[in-house]
Amino acid sequence: MILFLTSCSEVENTDTVVTNEVETDENESLESRAKRHVEASLTIPVNEKYSLKIYRANLDGDDREDAIITVNRYDFAIEEALKSNNTAKRAEVGYMGNYNYIFYYDGALNKISPPQVISSTPQAELTVKFDNITSQVYQDILIDYRIRNSSYKAIYSIRNHTPKRIFHWKNFDGLGTEQKEAYVLKFGEGTAGIQKDIYILKADFDNPESAEDLFTYSPDLRPTKEVLHHFFFVSSTDMYMTKK
């Protein structure tokens, strides 16, 4: 039996940025702390407009609420494009770059992690959902991000107080073209452990009829019954794999 690690047509797009830890005030709200931490970690000037959102859940199995903090720097992406010699080209590719970030707040430690950058198209902010995939005690993190007219889903699980990506796959591609493709993830009972198996179903969607922004438009995906791939969790690698 040959096992294959999960893969996607895109290159690895997540990196951790090493930063100095920001001093904390025990009585300060998470919203206020997150703002200070984000601005210090990413060296965001006071006059920059950016988006910061906080998504709360139990992500590591203790009795404290944790959180994922997302940051989108679309205005900064435009500013950098205007300063470059390739403004039109950057706009054409959707200002693709390092402008979407996630931070992890550990409720038990009461600390916010360094940022992880998710290279993507900044017109679309990251979308975050939670689900019990690798455990019934805590939830894992599902993040959707855009690369031009395509969309991808990454699944993270907390390891050593840090989000670790354990799976990723394409949601759709070719939006607005005849070469469109789409997939839907379905979770089922684990065959190799308590962690749920992942089934990739072929799906379809309708292209927008009007002049929608293809970098932000989210079509409704219609899954079929056709299973293209079946992944299961391998504890020794801490990743999802498939037989082939």
Describe every region a protein language model picked out.
Residues 2-49, 146-244:
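Acidic, small-residue rich beta-repeat scaffolds with periodic aromatic anchors
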Residues 8-120, 237, 241-244:
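Terminal domain-start segments
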Residues 51-59, 124-134, 138, 179-191:
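Beta-propeller blade termini
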Residues 59-71, 132-145, 191-201:
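Acidic/hydrophobic-patterned starts of short beta strands in beta-sheet-rich repeat architectures
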Residues 70, 82-86, 144, 154-159:
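"Short basic amphipathic alpha-helical interaction patches in structured regions
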Residues 96, 135, 146-150:
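Alpha-helix initiation and capping sites
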Residues 119-126, 170-175:
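Short coil/turn segments at the loop-to-beta-strand junctions that recur within blades
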